[in-house]
Amino acid sequence: MEDFVRQCFNPMIVELAEKAMKEYGEDPKIETNKFAAICTHLEVCFMYSDFHFIDERGESIIVESGDPNALLKHRFEIIEGRDRTMAWTVINSICNTTGVEKPKFLPDLYDYKENRFIEIGVTRREVHIYYLEKANKIKSEKTHIHIFSFTGEEMATKADYTLDDESRARIKTRLFTIRQEMASRGLWDSFRQSERGEETIEERFEITGTMRRLADQSLPPNFSSLENFRAYVDGFEPNGCIEGKLSQMSKEVNARIEPFLKTTPRPLRLPEGPPCSQRSKFLLMDALKLSIEDPSHEGEGIPLYDAIKCMKTFFGWKEPNIVKPHEKGINPNYLLAWKQVLAELQDIENEEKIPKTKNMKKTSQLKWALGENMAPEKVDFEDCKDVSDLKQYDSDEPEQRSLASWIQSEFNKACELTDSSWIELDEIGEDIAPIEHIASMRRNYFTAEVSHCRATEYIMKGVYINTALLNASCAAMDDFQLIPMISKCRTKEGRRKTNLYGFIIKGRSHLRNDTDVVNFVSMEFSLTDPRLEPHKWEKYCVLEIGDMLLRTAIGQVSRPMFLYVRTNGTSKIKMKWGMEMRRCLLQSLQQIESMIEAESSVKEKDMTKEFFENKSETWPIGESPKGVEEGSIGKVCRTLLAKSVFNSLYASPQLEGFSAESRKLLLIVQALRDNLEPGTFDLGGLYEAIEECLINDPWVLLNASWFNSFLTHALK
């Protein structure tokens, strides 16, 4: 940007701008956007006055070629660009000779024909907003305001534009050229966004009584009174160097601001160790459903009835056996637990009337799996406060894990389309206002793109499981209730379908606090052989429970059916959020909406229809080692949704920390890409804060590896 300014503007203007910035303690090399803005403003002021004269008769005339004999007086006195002392001297002399009221702020020009001061504004925003800010700041009827924008708009006091059309057109053309030149060098966006509003001087108002006493009590250390603190704040130079600001604030701080260059950032260090394992509350891409179409059986909609009906669609059950044991668990107990579920479901069918819920017998295998009587006994603090060596358990540091390829596959799968629709197009009443019409149009387009997405299936599955588990936890606190894992969808032909993924058995659930844990055992059907990626299934015991006939291109093939069993736990607060997973749809819709808004503001009309219907256009989806991945607008919707859903499924403190800390580094890198010349201090500390969140969580590790791809491509 600095080079551009020096090439684009007359050397005299550049010199004046540098002088003005130095007077305010600003550096043209650092605040390059401000440098460009000051030069532009100076040039507009000079162009405003160029060629305008007043002849002997006091008439205003335009003379383009200089006639040395003519007795002409410049129509405008230029005040902008002079140093402050000189500028006020000129103003004082004008006011003394003409009797015009003296302005409070330094204006830019004086018009000898109209006998008024002029404030010139050049804005990258809306002219009327800038006009109001200027008017608010000067609060003077006498000073005439004239605002130009880079888009050719202008606004002046009482629509009196002072100059003829041709002179104003010259100024507008020049501003447009500057904008084009900046845009062609990739400088315009950053320049446009860097404009700040006019600072208005606040009127002082006195604080008295109680508020005054509170103010005096709440001062920072070393300040005796509010006045003394105010004086300090007012004297605080807002645009000095950061180092100076910091040392003004505290004697202990000494930060060196280092420039952040393309070569500065290094990739994030991902942990070494065994590959990370699956930790979601239910299976994702590996889940298998037993389904019934057009359910119309008696008691349809009662989970237990639906589950039994789904189980009856499968005929390939066989004697279960363990194919992948759980390293630390008592595996025969998992096997016995599954056999118990089968036996108790059989018992239900032999009863006259099927009950609505099923509580499992409290067998030794279930007590073990659900951690019954495993919690250490709670002792009243009064009884043990005299124990001399009372201490908290030592807990081990979590073991570091490396990124495994399965989590990227999980994410890719979540972005794919399934052959069923998982959400209904909500029928909402007629739109009354135009904005409602646009909103429902966007919602309908978005719903069409994501209703068949696998991430949407995960949402509905998550909502169902968490709702059922929270209900059972409150309604049957002491019981080991059997909870079917069910979802509902519609086929391509619009037929209703009920799916069973497996079962959950809930442990004792006296949940007083939000964070109290309820244990559960999950048993889920799958066709995935766990021996292919044993590290993914570290927390599971996997049984082979049947053979399933699958239709393929070469006819029917038989595949072993597996049951993934594990002990897990959740809490009231986690279940509450799980029940609200539909919010992910809203979050991703809002992200898409901001993309549409950006398009619409450029084109100055609503672009919703074009945005979704222009199938040829591709959009950036994300970074991969290959570069920036692009795809259709539908793919963008589904990717954003999948990210939001995974943030919910894999929510963790590691993710919270990583998201917050890596965002800071992301903003610095984006500032560098926008040529804003960012500076940093303690970059090492920021890396430390990010990397302490990279421990063993698969979703966080995947995000960190995406972040590294982004760094590589962003800094090329």
Curated annotation (Swiss-Prot):
Superkingdom of the organism of origin: Viruses
Q: Does the keyword Phosphoprotein apply?
A: yes
Question: What's the record's note on cofactor binding?
Answer: Binds 2 manganese ions per subunit.
Q: Where in the cell is it found?
A: Host cytoplasm; Host nucleus
Give start-end ranges for motif Nuclear localization signal 2 (NLS2): 184-247
Q: Where does the motif Nuclear localization signal 1 (NLS1) lie?
A: 124-139
Asked if Hydrolase is a keyword of the record, the answer is yes
Write out the residues that bind Mn(2+) 1.
H41, D108, E119, I120
Instruction: Tell me one Pfam family matched here.
Output: Flu_PA
Query: Which InterPro entries does the record cross-reference, listed alphabetically?
Result: INFV_PA, PA/PA-X, PA/PA-X_sf
Which cofactor does the UniProt annotation name?
A: Mn(2+)
Q: Which GO terms describe its cellular component?
A: host cell cytoplasm; host cell nucleus
**N-terminal signal peptide:** none
In what way is this protein post-translationally modified?
Answer: Phosphorylated on serines and threonines by host kinases, including human casein kinase II.
EC code(s) of this entry: 3.1.-.-
Q: Which HAMAP family match?
A: INFV_PA
Q: Which family does it belong to?
A: Belongs to the influenza viruses PA family.
Subunit composition? Influenza RNA polymerase is composed of three subunits: PB1, PB2 and PA. Interacts (via C-terminus) with PB1 (via N-terminus).
What name is this protein filed under?
Polymerase acidic protein
